[in-house]
A protein has these predicted regions:
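Charged, terminal alpha-helix-loop-beta segments
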Residues: 1-156
């Protein structure tokens, strides 16, 4: 019998947040969600993760990668760099330092070429971009994460 596939609709950001949180191991083995809907300065981060190395990951979710998403993450990331002690108090289990700031993960339905060009110009140490697919496979709901871009810059 052949497998059957059908794309499922993700209704809103809240639904996407739950799908990602419930399936975060599909993004990266060892990644755990430790917080959600965190306000960092004036910017909201959808999910906060902790990876297998103990690094904090700011996870931004949306349907399309656009300037608004990029600016929101830049604002949140800047706040993290400006107030590292507050971040350490919020997440004492995380390994945070100037040499090891939070990672950035974008999880969107569609990444544009212009978005990828822009993030390559940023000075974040670690950025990962994923596209998600919510599918029904043989009657079962599954979420697939396609790792589209990984950027790593040397620490100063």
């Amino acid at each position: 019998m052949r497998p059957t596939f059908r794309k499922l609709e993700v209704k809103d950001i809240g639904h996407l947040e739950k799908l990602v949180a419930d399936n975060v191991e599909g993004v990266e083995p060892g990644l755990k969600v430790v917080d959600s809907r965190l306000l960092l300065g004036h910017a909201a981060i959808d999910l906060v993760g902790l990876d297998s190395r103990g690094s904090l990951a700011l996870i931004a979710l949306d349907f399309t990668a656009d300037e608004g998403l990029l600016l929101r993450v830049m604002d949140a990331y800047s706040w993290c760099l400006e107030f590292p002690d507050t971040l350490r108090r919020l997440y004492p289990m995380a390994q945070l330092s100037t040499a090891r700031p939070p990672r950035i993960l974008f999880i969107v339905e569609r990444l544009t070429d212009s978005f990828l060009r822009r993030i390559k110009q940023l000075s974040f140490l670690e950025i990962d971009c994923f596209e998600f697919r919510h599918l029904e496979v043989n009657g079962e709901s599954v979420v697939f994460f396609d790792h589209v871009e990984r950027l790593r810059k040397a620490a100063a």
